[in-house]
Amino acid sequence: MANSGNYGKRPFRGDESDEKKEADDDENIFPFFSARSQYDMRAMVSALTQVIGNQSSSHDNNQHQPVVYNQQDPNPPAPPTQDQGLLRKRHYRGVRQRPWGKWAAEIRDPQKAARVWLGTFETAEAAALAYDNAALKFKGSKAKLNFPERAQLASNTSTTTGPPNYYSSNNQIYYSNPQTNPQTIPYFNQYYYNQYLHQGGNSNDALSYSLAGGETGGSMYNHQTLSTTNSSSSGGSSRQQDDEQDYARYLRFGDSSPPNSGF
């Protein structure tokens, strides 16, 4: 009967209580560290996620933020003044444009206090060159020219020795020393020269005008025979009629110089 109470039970071993105690201690310790580590891990992940999110949003803002330029730039771009200067028309001394488009040139004779009609031209540059040649004849080195560089070139050429007595530049003929050959002075506008003589001009002046490129272009003439040469040789009858009509307009409307004519 004494053994009936212990039937079906294992006999108790002394070392079994120690193993159970260690297992219970392990169950109490490891769950504590596991929960703490999971909390720390979640905190670290949350912190890293927040940091990465802030960096990403800051980068996106920098990309989408428009670039603002300083309007008070100390070195602003210079305005294009060269093109504006080319658009402005240059005014030449002794030249004015006719209502029908041609360019007229005239000069005031300082000795006679009268204006000398130089003719009409297709371009303003040709008319300005005619004025320069006449101004050099009347006033010499004191003349105010439209193209002073041409006069300087002619002066430099006159100091050279040897033939020829004239040179050509841009289809314009200039005599370096007219006194060496007074019989062949170029004058391409016979009609206006005759009118000048008819009004009391001095034939000895032998106006040496180079009007190449003008309306009444021609070849060189001897100044001694200009007054007797047929007018048809200077450009044809139709061209002379145009010259006569234009000169008649000059006599009718050209009694007073226009403003800024520079005569």
From Swiss-Prot:
Cleaved by the APC/C-FZR1 complex. GO terms for molecular function: DNA binding; DNA-binding transcription factor activity. PROSITE patterns: AP2_ERF (PS51032). It comes from the Eukaryota. Residues 54-73 have a biased composition (Polar residues). GO terms for cellular component: nucleus. Gene3D superfamilies: AP2/ERF domain. Acts as a transcriptional activator of the phytosulfokine PSK5 peptide hormone. Binds to the GCC-box pathogenesis-related promoter element. Rate-limiting factor of quiescent center cell division active when surrounding stem cells are damaged. Is a proteolytic target of APC/C-FZR1 complex. This is Ethylene-responsive transcription factor ERF115. It comes from Arabidopsis thaliana.
